[in-house]
Amino acid sequence: MDKQKSAPSKWMISSMVVVAAIVALAIFVVVSNLGGKPAVDTSASTTPAGEVSPAGAPMTSATAAAGSSADGGASFCGLTAVEMTGTLTKAPVATWQLFGTTYVPAVDGHGPGKIDDDGYRHCYARTPTGALLAIANYDALDNPGTDAFTEKFVRTGTAPGPGREAAIEKLNEKLKQSATESSNPADRQIFQTIGFRILSYDGNTALVETASKSSAGYKVAWVQHLVWAEGDWKLLLADDASSLTDPTLISTLDGYIPWSA
């Protein structure tokens, strides 16, 4: 990593994992306040290969429900592919489409099975490929940067339960403040998926780690929890709408499966 570069400012990336993520719709919290440079050159990813649960990830009522709840229903948009076990050992062949300033993937039969008129992408197959596609597309939902997109994701893209309810409450508070606040688009960073690995998958839950590169040149990895609910893959939030795991700055893609447009 170029030590002359300053570390990226704190950005809660992608839609949904932390309170600021829900507000800002950006899927990676890039480490901030590092004194102008990363404190450690973190070449290791958020979760070492072979581990299926990041250390310190809190148990939530949503997590417990995901492990013991029923099916979650058939695909709400009619995707028929279902795999209750499995993983990915190579990158799926995807069609990449420019969405805002980020390329997003699609795989026939695995999703997204529904793209709304406003560009909102959802409905992914109950397969390891579908889970990966869900995360890669959710990462890009920040691009439109509208309150409507943010609210839609919080209400439909997060797992039902206390985390979603807390997120809606936080979002409503943010929307009330937005009339008196302003942001500088130039301060925002855009993230592009460049790699992944599936840490665990059982058809009801998935633990997916993605590696992305920011517009400032930094690489970041983050493990994200998905649960199958309401006929789609949903991002799992802690009960207070905070993140279940933290992102990590990385220097290489060692250990990841490269995957990009």
Residue ranges and their predicted role:
Residues A74, T80-E83, T89-G111, K219-S251:
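Short beta-strand edge/turn micro-motifs at domain boundaries
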Residues Q4-K5, M16-V17, I27-G35, E51, ...:
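Low-complexity, intrinsically disordered terminal/linker segments enriched in charged
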Residues D2-K3, A131-N143, V208-K213, V223-W228:
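Primarily hydrophobic membrane-targeting regions of prokaryotic envelope proteins
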Residues I13-A21:
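Hydrophobic H-region at the start of alpha-helical membrane spans
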Residues D147-D232, L237-S242, D246-D254, P258:
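Structured, amphipathic secondary-structure segments that form assembly/contact surfaces
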Residues F99-L175:
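Core segments of small alpha/beta cavity-forming domains
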Residues M1-I13:
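Short, low-complexity patches enriched in S/T/P/G
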Residues G36-T101, A261:
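N-terminal low-complexity, Pro/Thr-rich disordered segments
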